[in-house]
Amino acid sequence: MVNECKILFESEIVLLKIYNIIDFIYIQYKMIEKKINPITPSQRQTLLLKRGTLTRVFKVKSLTKGFQRSNGRNNQGRITVRHRGGGHKRLYRIINFDRFNNNIEGFTKKILYDPNRSANIAYIEKSSKYYLILAPDGLKINQYIKSSPNADLKIGNALPLRNIPIGSLIHNISLYPQSKGKLIRSAGTSAQLIQKIDDKYAKIRLNSGELKLVLLTCYATLGVVSNVNHKTIKLGKAGRSRWLNRRPSVRGVAKNPVDHPHGGGEGKTSGGRPSVTPWGKITKGKPTRKKKKLLIQ
């Protein structure tokens, strides 16, 4: 009788795992590439993602606001970031990155598309309070989300690094105690907690392989950021890039000598020197930061 109960229990566990895998595959299928009939060259190159499981229209006024793009200009009106301008008009969704606030808890009502970032966002609601947070991969509707030192070790919950097991995948990591999450917020990214040092620091490995030390009292959210297939997108045409507020980038060799170090020459030229920026700095392969600076100051 005991053996039969064990067999039944194990079979139920196996079935539950199978159902979870099927559910995960179904959700991933809903978010895979969108097939476009290749009538034109641009459509033939295009590779987009389906958003069948996402809510596109969001009408909570207190969590949205209009904003004027800077288009790469500073407060003096001078261009500090090139190749920015145009783009479709958007409403900004006010995301709550300060998960150290223990009052942030509730049920996930919607998974939303956000045109202002690569990741999806989640609408959290409890009684009369509601928030928008970054949606981790695998977050489900009606799942309970909590930010607390005593929160369960579940995807979407936020805890201090002190209370997160070593080896866990995390995102939205704050750099200082009582501050908003700054690291690991793009689609499909995650960091790994690999060590706790002297009961004071946590060593984390970022997506790039870089190691950082942050205080154990800093908060992080469990899981990988949603929309993991974002990197497979192919825009297909220049117009779609313009919709995203990106302007064309002119090659240096196509310019005049006064405008770029690679410019000028009679006919087509290769530039005549290693690739550099318009200001003469090497662009390919030159390190631009210190690798061994572990501590975030």
Predicted regions and their residues:
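Basic, glycine/proline-rich low-complexity segments that contact nucleic acids
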Residues: 29-117, 137-297
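Beta-strand/loop nucleic-acid-binding surfaces
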Residues: 130-138
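Glycine-centered tight beta-turn/hairpin loop motif at sheet-sheet or coil-to-beta transitions
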Residues: 126-129, 207-209
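Aromatic (phenylalanine/tyrosine) cluster motif
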Residues: 9, 19, 24-29
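Structural recognition of beta-strand segments within beta-rich domains
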Residues: 116, 124-126
